[in-house]
Amino acid sequence: MKKIKNFRWWIAGLIGLATAINYLDRQNLPIALSEIRKTIVISDVDYGLINSIFLFSYGTMYAIGGRILDVLGSRAGYAIMIVWWSLSNILHGLVSSVTGLGLARFLLGIGEGGGFPGSAKVVSEWFPGKERALAFGIFNAGSSVGAVIAPPLIAAIIAVANWRWTFIISGLLGLVWVIVWLQIYTQPQQSKFTTDSEKDYISTALQSERDANPTKENRVSWLSLFKDRDVW
């Protein structure tokens, strides 16, 4: 297997692409809303409630997603999150009622809420502290990319097919991404694409950080977190 120089930056690009898909998926509903209303009766109140449902599940998962990823690991955990939100996105294209749309939106929020914690975990595993700001910037730039490409792409799909296909196609993009992810992602030291010098560089840098900042595991209650002003 041919090694790829500075493979960690390819990983940053890959999670940036996942973030772009994340934001593309969530833009489907507001952009396609006028077309959806030709099929499903959605009042302004209904639409506001649907958005609130999404934000509730998204915000909840955003808060606890990191813990779930710590348990599952970045490779499996991130893949599960993206499969979840991709299937939820496809579900939007299959519903025929406001209730179904609200359920699909709730499920989408659960999956997408784990996206940022997953990306952050990957960066912490592959990048020394001095490179993390740039790595965070690369994956976070995906949010802007997704938001920019969403309007013309969704409009084109609607023009060629219909609004249901905007959800189905963007959901399938996420599933294709997961296939690539599972083929290439492991921890740096087990990666078949990473050069020995890069493995040594990452390992040495991360170990130096741990040695310089030794920590002890302490259980922290949720209540104490909510009382901490820095959390807010």
Predicted regions mapped to residue ranges:
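Cytoplasmic helix-loop-helix junction between adjacent transmembrane helices
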Residues: 104-143
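Helix-loop-helix hairpin linking two adjacent transmembrane segments in secondary transporters
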Residues: 139-190
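Juxtamembrane cytosolic amphipathic helices that cap and anchor the N-termini
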Residues: 5-14, 220-232
